[in-house]
């Protein structure tokens, strides 16, 4: 399969990340202490796609590396559900290094190892699902494009994941680029249609949505307005950014955890180059959250 070259390149990136982290460890330690002492520690939300050893892709992490990630995260962070991460970042003060774990798409192999491993450790995660591949059994379009037709989850597996205590989230019906859709009806069909399918499977209520691809250009004001109107508790992007205490917390920024251990450690040990989000967004951040959504968020964290 034509994906070996990116993994060789990723090996060099891991080495470079380790070297840079080593060179800046003193600066990072001082910054960590200052943020903890000042109760200003940002919250990280990680996203994975597929945990498997066979057929590696740029959005796959090996079982061994996933275990290493979890070991290190458990030693250094509170690992909390997405709703609790949202609650903490809405508080003006946070002194506890905090991580939430999410998955995108819905790959069958996650039921072989990742989900059981999280369950064994009693760790929470939110599992965002693109529904049409689950219904049809067809591989995701980005896998077909890379000549690597990996199996999606089945409806029964999604139900099993939910029954195991993991939260299910929306990820559109067809894993489309929402930023390319200009008609409200098309955006509704992809976002709300996917959520309705998930809830019809008995895995709701669906509280969170993640944008496929997740870069700023893959989002839109139309979609954000629709999510607010539909009463969802928040949405996730995936372009690599922290979430700072005292924010509204409807937009949840995520960090890509698939690439490897050293890039993950470099991010989460406070790389000073990445502390602030300088991305131009095609939507206005909500300035306040409707009270009914805040009440729903309180109920989620109380469960």
Residues of each region from the PLM?
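C-terminal active-site subregion of NodB/CE4 polysaccharide deacetylases
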Residues: 2-102, 109, 180-303
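A short, conserved beta-to-alpha structural element at the edge of catalytic cores
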Residues: 122-144
